[in-house]
């Protein structure tokens, strides 16, 4: 507010005596307008809503620690190797020729 609002000509300076004390305490709009103008600053301070104490809340549980970044895993393993081959078989002798022919039968006795 400018100083003109506070000291308008024609308004007596002992104006608060005209104000209803209840109006000053309650800051009601039905009070005399000239009285309200004079008391607006004091009134706005008195009419603040009562400051309630902060509610007694239980403290919030702490947040779990954030996870570290995942480790860099190696690439997946290749498929397992096949079982080793068995040892080579021993050589088998191959039959290359027929057995000798039988001798001629013996001549009959005379």
From Swiss-Prot:
Lineage: Eukaryota, Metazoa, Chordata, Craniata, Vertebrata
Superkingdom of source: Eukaryota
Family of this protein: Belongs to the cornifin (SPRR) family.
Protein name: Late cornified envelope-like proline-rich protein 1
Renumbered residue ranges of the record's region Disordered: 1-24
InterPro entries on file: Lelp1 (IPR026076)
Taxonomic source organism: Bos taurus
């Amino acid at each position: 507010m400018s100083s003109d609002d506070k000291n308008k000509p024609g308004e007596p300076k002992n104006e608060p005596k005209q104000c209803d004390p209840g109006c000053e305490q309650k800051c009601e709009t039905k009070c005399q307008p000239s009285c309200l103008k004079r008391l607006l600053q004091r009134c706005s301070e008195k009419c603040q809503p009562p400051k309630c104490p902060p509610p007694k809340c239980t403290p919030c549980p702490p947040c779990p620690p954030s996870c570290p970044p995942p480790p860099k895993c190696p690439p997946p393993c290749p498929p397992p190797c096949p079982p080793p081959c068995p040892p080579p078989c021993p050589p088998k002798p191959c039959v290359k020729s027929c057995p000798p022919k039988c001798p001629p039968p013996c001549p009959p006795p005379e």
